[in-house]
Amino acid sequence: MATAAVAVREDSGSGMKAELAPRPGAEGREMTQEEKLQLRKEKKQQKKKRKEEKGTETETGSAVSAAQCQVGPAKHLAGPDSQLGTAKEKVPAGRSKAELRAERRAKQEAERAMKQARKGDQGGPPPQACPSTAGETPSGVKRLPEHSQVDDPTLLRRLVKKPERQQVPTRKDYGSKVSLFSHLPQYSRQNSLTQFMSIPSSVIHPAMVRLGLQYSQGLVSGSNARCIALLRALQQVIQDYTTPPSEELSRDLVNKLKPYFSFLTQCRPLSASMYNAIKLLNKEITGVSGSKREEEAKSELRAAIDRYIKEKIVLAAQAISRFAYKKISNGDVILVYGCSSLVSHILQEAWAKGRQFRVVVVDSRPRLEAKHTLRSLVRAGVPASYLLIPAASYVLPEVSKVLLGAHALLANGSVMSRVGTAQLALVARAHNVPVLVCCETYKFCERVQTDAFVSNELDDPDDLLCERGEHVALANWQNHSSLRLLNLVYDVTPPELVDLVITELGMIPCSSVPVVLRVKSSDQ
């Protein structure tokens, strides 16, 4: 009589035995196909049972962990008598390994929660008792830090120490500032930055000293003009540069230029276009091969600067002029604001090609820059009228379109331009007049800004003083502690007020700025 073999499995966790059905083929005879299939099914069922048992053990362990996680901090905060998870507790016999692991994990979470609670009592961050699950949202309210990055005292001290380490003179603040803009440096033309600077012993190249003085005195203004002047000065610096012995040009020249940029920043903050030009120049310098001769490498760098000026500024202005020409019709009344070299070039090109239109030039104090635009248009024969910004709302009913320049185009589509631009765009929207912004793509930056408070530039407050004969309004204003003068340079226009941005790549909406930035970064 054949004896049937019984497969017995003893579970190490629970001590239970599971008996399976008699296994055929135990006498040594060859198993049939049906018996093999049946044996295979039995093995699958065994694996399935093992997985189910492990799943129940894991669920039990997580439930215990969650329960102890909720109760644990309260027990620890209650008093020293309730000690959870100490070595004095005896582990009851007959528990599985999974349960022991879950209990140990719960004890660790409780101890961690107690430590966090103690830190919270001492003024630290609020305790996080348990890690939240995937579907839960944190119930605690996140608070803003006491200082943002722009007015953080430690960051400001670090920025002040940096020019000192580079042996760069620092400009002192002038007068009292409005509290909203206390984190921005206050510039004054009365405080000379180079008064006690000795040119032979200074680390700053004379070309950079001359450029910084031109920036601070307002002799070179405008994003394009400032960027071109910077690149020409860098060409002179590269021409006079000599690589020290046991040094590489690609490394030493980058470090050599850092104090120069710090000095220019002390004279006047760099524009977004200048930052992009410096970034590309540093990339060109670091890409110089060490096997090249010094003269060859320097000539290549100067050629790269010439190529950048031609492609990004000169040719870009010509392409923008062709696109903007399509938007100008005969009989148009075009309103422009301030002094934009690009807008002035577009209007003169359109007039030279035969378009008949009239220009309304809007200006604002204290710089009155639009007078330069007015002179260039009158010199080219373009009919133009001139007024100040408070009277702009009276002429907008007869204006057909507004043509504006830009200091920078931010990643969120906002336009950073001369202060007063946002006001004009808002009044134009109220009169249903389209607003067109002309801007080269090298002015696009990855910075995001929705207002003019976080990052801006404060010009000399003495420019606001109005001189009428011998009488000067607001004279000796520094002696009045309750009086503060604010001379903002830029404002931020939201993208909702701009209908179109004309670039060398074509006419795009403000929302396409991130796309252009992405394409430019991939090309580089």
UniProtKB/Swiss-Prot annotation:
GO biological process: cytoplasmic translational initiation; myelination; oligodendrocyte development; ovarian follicle development; T cell receptor signaling pathway; translational initiation
Residues with Phosphoserine modification: S12
Calcium keyword on record: no
Quaternary context: Component of the translation initiation factor 2B (eIF2B) complex which is a heterodecamer of two sets of five different subunits: alpha, beta, gamma, delta and epsilon. Subunits alpha, beta and delta comprise a regulatory subcomplex and subunits epsilon and gamma comprise a catalytic subcomplex. Within the complex, the hexameric regulatory complex resides at the center, with the two heterodimeric catalytic subcomplexes bound on opposite sides.
Protein name (Swiss-Prot/TrEMBL): Translation initiation factor eIF2B subunit delta
Annotated segments matching region May bind the chemical integrated stress response (ISR) inhibitor ISRIB: 171-180
UniProt modified residues of type N-acetylalanine: A2
Any one Pfam family match given in the protein's UniProt record, by short name: IF-2B
Entry-annotated residues carrying Phosphothreonine: T86
Biased composition regions of type Basic residues, renumbered to the chain: 41-51
Keyword check for Oxidoreductase: no
Keywords: Acetylation, Cytoplasm, Initiation factor, Phosphoprotein, Protein biosynthesis
Record family assignment: Belongs to the eIF-2B alpha/beta/delta subunits family.
Subcellular location: Cytoplasm, Cytosol
GO MF annotations, alphabetized: guanyl-nucleotide exchange factor activity; translation initiation factor activity
Region annotated Disordered, chain positions: 1-173
Record's function text: Acts as a component of the translation initiation factor 2B (eIF2B) complex, which catalyzes the exchange of GDP for GTP on eukaryotic initiation factor 2 (eIF2) gamma subunit. Its guanine nucleotide exchange factor activity is repressed when bound to eIF2 complex phosphorylated on the alpha subunit, thereby limiting the amount of methionyl-initiator methionine tRNA available to the ribosome and consequently global translation is repressed.
Means of activity regulation: Activated by the chemical integrated stress response (ISR) inhibitor ISRIB which stimulates guanine nucleotide exchange factor activity for both phosphorylated and unphosphorylated eIF2.
Residue ranges with Basic and acidic residues bias: 26-40, 87-121, 161-173
Domain of life, source organism: Eukaryota
Main location: cytoplasm
GO cellular component assignments: cytoplasm; cytosol; eukaryotic translation initiation factor 2B complex
